[in-house]
């Protein structure tokens, strides 16, 4: 039995609140249960130096956790003067995932900067961030089209993400912190709205997992992401 009494395939309640802040071109508060992440998308003219003159755009991401997003206060990384390896890994994952969803030629020489700030953490912050950031990205692209900056929508498809893992010997979907911290296997899966895989991050924290267990976890992820994409679409309608 899971601590929350959810079934193995059951995700936490997912809520997406658009236009959560006033200034960003795209702004979303995404909630996976008690995990809450603020995702903003900023539309900026120009591209990084390595892309100048190539007629294509760029999507990049930054990620951070507020000091009291966790049970005990964390020192701000800005105060330490250095980003952790975890932070760098997660923001690269978010950026890679979102770039897969955008036609960079249609974006033109423009950049979209995604900022994901974890307000409250209870497991699955990176998957929540990707899910919310995708909706913020859609709003930023629509803003640019409304301003006449973009003639064609560069979005190829929606993307979403969910965590899966093996907890007490059983494959489960959307791990909360108490499950994540005790899981034998932990995996994050990013997929398109049609179920195609963008990225899989999977690690055996305890016992190695079998090929059959891997397929079972991917099936759980596909089912969970399908439900999350439906919530994304409802929020955008």
UniProtKB/Swiss-Prot annotation:
Homohexameric ring arranged as a trimer of dimers. The gene is rph. GO terms for biological process: rRNA catabolic process; rRNA processing; tRNA processing. Its EC number is 2.7.7.56. InterPro entries: ExoRNase_PH_dom1, ExoRNase_PH_dom2, ExoRNase_PH_dom2_sf, PNPase/RNase_PH_dom_sf, Ribosomal_Su5_D2-typ_SF, RNase_PH, RNase_PH_bac-type, RNase_PH_CS. Belongs to the RNase PH family. The keyword rRNA processing applies. It catalyses: tRNA(n+1) + phosphate = tRNA(n) + a ribonucleoside 5'-diphosphate. This is Ribonuclease PH. CDD domains: RNase_PH_bact (cd11362). Phosphorolytic 3'-5' exoribonuclease that plays an important role in tRNA 3'-end maturation. Removes nucleotide residues following the 3'-CCA terminus of tRNAs; can also add nucleotides to the ends of RNA molecules by using nucleoside diphosphates as substrates, but this may not be physiologically important. Probably plays a role in initiation of 16S rRNA degradation (leading to ribosome degradation) during starvation. GO terms for molecular function: 3'-5'-RNA exonuclease activity; tRNA binding; tRNA nucleotidyltransferase activity. It comes from Shewanella pealeana (strain ATCC 700345 / ANG-SQ1). Phosphate binds at residues 86, 124-126. Keywords: Nucleotidyltransferase, RNA-binding, rRNA processing, Transferase, tRNA processing, tRNA-binding.
